[in-house]
C-alpha cells in the first residue's frame, strides 16, 4: 500500500481553524495550537449564550412592561393578571415594543386591563 502524505489535508484543517479564529487577539488568532483551543472555547460560549439570550430578552421585555405599566398605575403582576381576564393575547415582546415605541397604544391596553380588573 502506498504511503499517505497528509500535507494537503493538514494544511486545509489548519486553514479552516485559523479562518474561524480570525479577529482573535494575539497568538489566539495566528498560532494553530492556541487558535484551535480558542475556537473550541468560542464555540462553547456561542452554544451557551444562544440559550441564555432567550432568558435575557424575556427579562428585558418584562422590565420594560413593568416600568411602563407602573407609570400608568399598575404593577407587572396586576397588569398580566388583567390581560388574562380581559382575554388580550399579546406576547411580552410585542407589549414591550408598544411600551417603548407607541405609548398611546400601550396606554389604551392598560385602560382596558384596568376596566376589567375593576369589574372583577
Swiss-Prot record:
A matching Pfam family: Ribosomal_L20
Gene name tied to this protein: rplT
BP GO terms, sorted: ribosomal large subunit assembly; translation
Protein role: Binds directly to 23S ribosomal RNA and is necessary for the in vitro assembly process of the 50S ribosomal subunit. It is not involved in the protein synthesizing functions of that subunit.
GO cellular component terms given for this protein: ribonucleoprotein complex; ribosome
Family annotation (CDD domains): Ribosomal_L20
Source species of the chain: Paracidovorax citrulli (strain AAC00-1) (Acidovorax citrulli)
The protein's name: Large ribosomal subunit protein bL20
InterPro entries found in the cross-reference section: Ribosomal_bL20, RIBOSOMAL_L20_CS, Ribosomal_protein_bL20_C
UniProt family annotation: Belongs to the bacterial ribosomal protein bL20 family.
Amino acid at each position: 500500500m502506498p504511503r499517505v502524505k497528509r500535507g494537503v489535508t493538514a494544511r486545509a484543517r489548519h486553514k479552516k481553524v485559523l479562518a474561524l479564529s480570525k479577529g482573535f487577539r494575539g497568538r489566539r488568532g495566528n498560532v494553530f495550537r492556541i487558535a484551535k483551543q480558542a475556537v473550541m472555547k468560542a464555540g462553547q460560549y456561542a452554544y451557551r449564550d444562544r440559550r441564555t439570550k432567550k432568558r435575557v430578552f424575556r427579562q428585558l421585555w418584562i422590565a420594560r412592561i413593568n416600568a411602563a405599566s407602573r407609570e400608568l398605575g399598575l404593577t407587572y403582576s396586576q397588569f398580566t393578571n388583567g390581560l388574562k381576564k380581559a382575554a388580550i393575547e399579546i406576547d411580552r415582546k410585542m407589549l414591550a415594543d408598544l411600551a417603548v415605541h407607541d405609548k398611546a397604544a400601550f396606554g389604551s391596553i392598560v385602560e382596558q386591563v384596568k376596566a376589567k380588573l375593576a369589574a372583577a
